[in-house]
A protein has these predicted regions:
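Serine-hydrolase catalytic core recognition
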Residues: 333, 370, 376, 467, ...
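Positively charged n-region of N-terminal signal peptides that target proteins for export
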Residues: 1-5
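Beta-propeller folds
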Residues: 7-8, 12-514, 520-531, 535-537, ...
Length: 717
């Protein structure tokens, strides 16, 4: 058999004759125009404070790819689309910030300063204008004060008086090459060492012996003055009293970071008693260095990339700082080594040991009344995830929920965590049933209960403003569509709001009467729509992104077929069959990358170049199939983890079975089947060509993964 390994397969096909429908020429050059053909997707939609306007990022298909996105605005009903000027953009509130419990004001950071928006008048007030970076503002429960971070510490500001209170004193670790501090400490002035330039510190100008003698005589003279002169005694007493008061007010101990410690995140508790600091310790991992030969300087420059798998990674602990005393308590997650039992999927029992297990802890999530806190923790090996109740006073935790997976914890919305309206339960996402669903766990005691269930996935979730209901995007109707739903805040049936087949990514307006919907379909790129937030409401299209000639071609709404696998499983695939199909023609299989990604569905694919290339292949007589092999997203936990510790196993089997399906069911010549893919798809292509040479005649491995020792650290499987 004549077999050829071609990198890439596209090179053998780039001479395809132009196929036209209307005025569009189906050529390699045309489909590789990228956004110049399919347009730039609108992104990051957000509503105005009064829900009357929608803002989003977008560019015209004629804009250069390296040009920044522009900010556009439209009215609530989708009319009045226009690009905002730079001056108008500067007047917009930031996309992220915090709203007070009274819903009256919105505080945010912009250009390293703080601003507050009055939701009743629309007026914006600048709160800070400094050379320091103010960030992460949040309202306190009284809605009159905010806390924020500046210079690695937490501050509280009154919006009425402007009074500023520092809530923590976190001192960064000194650089490793910093000079030693003079004996005089912070008061050492400009002096260095014991005998030179002591300034106002204790260093003095003379040597150690001279300083000692001078100090003794000065002390005698000072005491004599106090004994002989009453005015001096009174001044000294007043000074001592003032110093005592100052020390009483400044009794908070500093939290001195040591060595290579850094603070990644800060948070103030609602009662203002504690500051939480995520303290990171870097591991011994070395970055992958990539040479940049084309630089602005004309010299070769190093680009530090990610570290490799197996390297020691950074660890993070949560410190609890008492805002009055400065005393530090560390969160104790209670998980010790050993903690292993991989015999089945059940949660392993914890065995006592002296060494803490390495957990990555999140920051506390507080109940609405500010009285209770929970945190999430994930083991470094990603096999376990916990939800803990936290006692801020002691740092002790109590387990509320625990998930264990012999492969790795994952799935959509895996980091979801919040409080139910009753403030007695927390909601979270879990694949414990085999599919990603929403659960509620009681804070005090008891087992978690399922809020959603079935052989489908909840892809993302958020609460309504009054927490009376959930808004969800889910695949309830089947794995190939993502619809937008609402559900009672206590669980129950789902009501479908945005229901056209395809993918819906929804942003709800502040008044919750309207939604902005980023919607796409198999042969329709993502566009922005607006609609009322009610059952089966009609959508109004706001944007048109592709070049006009894109719509001149009849892009295929590729049917989804089920490929029978050797173990009895049905593997989803998209089929591209030429209109002029002749039995015995060639076949091709596209293998998507990323591994954990879904490419067989009714949305516009992120692999749109490959989607259009499938049309070129069809025009040349190829029957093409795209496969969501084992390890792909969208089909539950077991599908996701089926390749654990054996990449190139079941995933490759699915590709081989797809080739057999093309021959047996679609009339393709089994001796004329090739495959191609990039990244993980390139890896599968290499595995196929080297281990299945009797199945595949040609292969194109683009940017392939060829050595798993070089994969990204903490990347599962």
């Amino acid at each position: 058999m004549n077999r050829k390994l071609i990198f890439p397969l596209a090179l053998a096909l780039c001479l395809a004759q132009a196929q036209t429908t209307g005025q569009f020429a189906l050529t390699i050059d045309n489909i590789m125009r990228g956004p110049g053909l399919v347009g730039y997707e609108p992104a990051q939609p957000r509503w105005s404070y009064d829900s009357q306007h929608i803002y989003f990022q977008w560019k015209q298909y004629t804009d250069k790819e390296d040009a920044p996105m522009d900010t556009y605005a439209a009215n609530r009903d989708g009319s009045g689309l226009r690009k905002l000027s730079d001056a108008e953009v500067r007047q917009l509130p930031a996309a992220t910030g915090d709203t007070g419990k009274d819903k009256r004001r919105f505080v945010y950071a912009s250009s390293d300063d703080l601003y507050v928006l009055d939701n009743t008048t629309g007026k914006i007030q600048q709160l800070t204008k400094t050379t320091e970076v103010e960030a992460n503002p949040h309202f306190l429960p009284d809605s009159k004060r905010i806390w924020f971070t500046r210079g690695g510490n937490v501050y509280v500001m009154s919006l009425d008086s402007g009074m500023l209170v520092q809530m923590s004193d976190i001192v960064p670790a000194a650089p490793a090459n910093a000079p030693a501090t003079a004996a005089g400490g912070r008061g050492g002035g400009r002096g260095q060492g014991q005998g030179q330039g002591g300034g106002r510190g204790q260093g003095g100008r003379g040597g150690a012996a001279d300083q000692a003698a001078s100090s003794a005589s000065q002390t005698y003279l000072k005491n004599e003055q106090k004994e002989l002169i009453e005015a001096v005694r009174e001044r000294v007493a007043a000074k001592d009293e003032a110093e005592a008061k100052r020390k009483a007010l400044a009794q908070r101990k500093p939290f001195n970071l040591t060595g290579t410690q850094t603070v990644r995140e800060l948070q103030l508790s609602p009662d203002e008693k504690y500051v939480f600091a995520a303290v990171a310790e870097p591991g011994t991992a070395k970055p992958t260095v990539v040479p940049n030969y084309i630089s602005d300087t004309g010299y070769v420059e190093d680009i530090n990339g990610r570290s490799n798998v197996g390297d020691s990674q950074a660890t993070t602990r949560i410190a609890i700082l008492n805002t009055d005393s400065g005393e530090v308590t560390w969160v104790d997650h209670g998980q010790r080594i050993p903690h292993t039992n991989d015999s089945d999927g059940a949660a392993p029992a914890r065995a006592p040991a002296s060494q803490d297990r390495d957990l990555q802890l999140g920051m506390p999530v507080w109940s609405d009344d500010g009285a209770k806190a929970v945190i999430a923790g994930r083991s470094a090996d990603s096999k376990d995830r916990w939800i803990f109740a936290l006692d801020p006073a002691t740092g002790k935790t109590r387990e509320l929920a625990h998930d264990h997976d012999n492969a790795w914890i994952g799935g959509p919305a895996a980091n979801t965590l919040g409080w139910m309206k009753n403030d007695r339960e927390v909601y979270f996402q879990s694949e414990r049933s085999g599919y990603a669903h929403l659960y509620a766990a009681p804070f005090d005691a008891g087992d978690a209960r399922a809020l959603t269930s079935g052989n489908w996935e909840v892809l993302n979730v958020r609460q309504s403003r009054d927490r009376s209901k959930f808004y969800l995007t889910a695949s309830k109707e089947g794995p190939f569509d993502q619809f937008f739903y609402e559900m009672s805040g206590d669980g129950g049936p789902l009501t479908r709001i945005a229901g056209e087949p395809g993918k819906h990514s929804v942003t709800v307006s502040p008044d919750e009467r309207s939604i902005a919907d980023l919607y796409s379909y198999t042969n329709k790129p993502t566009e922005l729509y607006v609609r009322e937030n009610q059952l089966q409401s009609a959508a109004t299209k706001v944007t048109t992104s592709p070049a006009p000639e894109f719509s001149q071609y009849k892009w295929l709404d590729a049917p989804i077929v089920m490929v029978p696998a050797r173990d009895g499983v049905k593997v989803p695939a998209r089929l591209f069959k030429p209109a002029n199909f002749k039995k015995g023609g060639p076949g091709a299989i596209f293998v998507h990358g990323a591994g954990y990604l879904q490419n067989v569905d009714h949305k516009w694919s992120s692999y749109y170049h490959e989607y259009m290339f499938d049309h070129i292949l069809m025009a040349r007589g190829f029957t093409v199939i795209d496969v969501d092999y084992r390890g792909s997203a969208g089909y539950g936990r077991d599908w996701r983890t089926a390749v654990y510790e054996h990449m190139g196993g079941k995933d490759l089997d699915d590709i081989v079975d797809a080739a057999k399906y093309l021959a047996a069911e679609q009339g393709v010549d089994p001796k004329k089947i090739g495959l191609w893919g990039g990244s993980y798809g390139g890896f599968i292509t290499l595995m196929a060509m080297f281990t299945q040479p009797d199945v595949f005649t040609a292969g194109g491995a683009l940017r392939p993964v060829s050595d798993w020792a070089n994969r990204k650290a903490r990347r599962s499987p």
